[in-house]
UniProtKB/Swiss-Prot annotation:
InterPro entries: CysN_GTP-bd, CysN_II, CysN_NoDQ_III, G_TR_CS, GTP-eEF1A_C, P-loop_NTPase, Small_GTP-bd, SO4_adenylTrfase_lsu. Pfam families: GTP-eEF1A_C (PF22594), GTP_EFTU (PF00009). Residues 204-206 are annotated as: G5. With CysD forms the ATP sulfurylase (ATPS) that catalyzes the adenylation of sulfate producing adenosine 5'-phosphosulfate (APS) and diphosphate, the first enzymatic step in sulfur assimilation pathway. APS synthesis involves the formation of a high-energy phosphoric-sulfuric acid anhydride bond driven by GTP hydrolysis by CysN coupled to ATP hydrolysis by CysD. Keywords: ATP-binding, GTP-binding, Nucleotide-binding, Nucleotidyltransferase, Transferase. Disulfide bonds: none annotated. This is Sulfate adenylyltransferase subunit 1. It catalyses: sulfate + ATP + H(+) = adenosine 5'-phosphosulfate + diphosphate.
Amino acid sequence: MNNHIQTAISEQGIEAYLHAQQHKSLLRFLTCGSVDDGKSTLIGRLLHDSQQIYEDQLKALESDSQKLGTTGEKLDLALLVDGLQAEREQGITIDVAYRYFSTAKRKFIISDTPGHEQYTRNMATGASTCDLAIILIDARKGVLDQTRRHSFIASLLGIKQFVVAVNKMDLVEFSQEVFERISAEYREFAKKLSVDTIHIVPVSALDGDNVVNPSDKLAWYQGETLLSLLESAEVERELERHPVRLPVQYVNRPNLDFRGFAGTLASGILRVGDKLAVLPSGKESTVTRIVTFDGDLDYALPGQAITVTFADEIDISRGDLLVDAARKPLVTQNLLAHIVWMGEESLQPGRVYDVKLATKKSRGQVEAIRHRIEINKLDELDASELKLNEIGLCELSLTDPVAFDPYQEIRDTGSFILIDRLTNVTVGAGMIVEGLAAKVATGHYSEFEVELNALVRKHFPHWQALTISNDASKE
């Protein structure tokens, strides 16, 4: 057992300790930056200096540092995080590594994401659930293209809080001038990003300067340490202020006397007595019970797995979205979205993919790529396809109407994945910007052709027939 935890349990008792842990706030954050900026070392330093390493881990780390370490006689703290053998042997991070730790003030989940451009998809995966991003910058190199790329992706994935850690300050003799030059350059670049708060902090992860404890070598820096910034960062409460969104995962009917609809509340505070609408059908009813494994609730918060029952018998199935009847999202078959392409084969407009948005499954295709984003310079370039790890702004059409919110407002109902229909492999991740109007083909059509078109679109949506209208009928 970890000595820090053992001491806490002996002082408080096991029940009091577990109760305190359960009620601490949780911050999810990721570390990202250029290759070999020290991401894994920084996480190892956080774990080590906050006394979150178990005795057996420490012994294994001492042994591994002698065999695989890159820090001489010192502990190579990066080995705490670089779990894959390929990563350890190469001294780089490839996969997204998750780590958990806590302090007296807060619990943390860390995503250590790869710095290489060919692993952009891995980084997007790690960023999608985080509240805050730590952007590492090598004090010797300053702001690089990879720094800009990671900052842009984190912003695109909805992260609003950045902590920029200017690392390896020991290699520039803890120079205030170097730190201030890098700070000014990064803040100028960050004006292009959709970020609410940016803190910039000088650190040396190798020796622990200003990571957990203040350093005399950085006496000119008057701000907080890195850990202090993480402990004081605002945990995202915005979801509670948004309207209720509950994607239906399955219909719960254990007997003839009970019929509930189960799912994880995506946003809003749901209360017994609330009036909800079912989308896309639009039917409405009042919530009579909120049921959980531990019993009934008067209200539910975002992230809770619940089952709701209604006053009326209405048709609801998996994939439907239960929403605040007074604050409904848009429903459409046409979307504008940023897509991060994760497939080995390029994204080709016109090819049909399976689409999963929350619990809703449909089929769809990219009608057009408006532009590809050159993620190192943030330039918008013309493109006819998207290759592995590329990001583009795309027009997407679906076979079924879907209810959605813009991704920057509610992640769960504003994101989707594209699945290859032959291999069942996830090949793309999408963040919805807005809905688009349906495309209409106009011309001279007979009344029969217009009616047949409406019939085909209603009963055979997977044919993806365009809506047609008769010019003469508009005159």
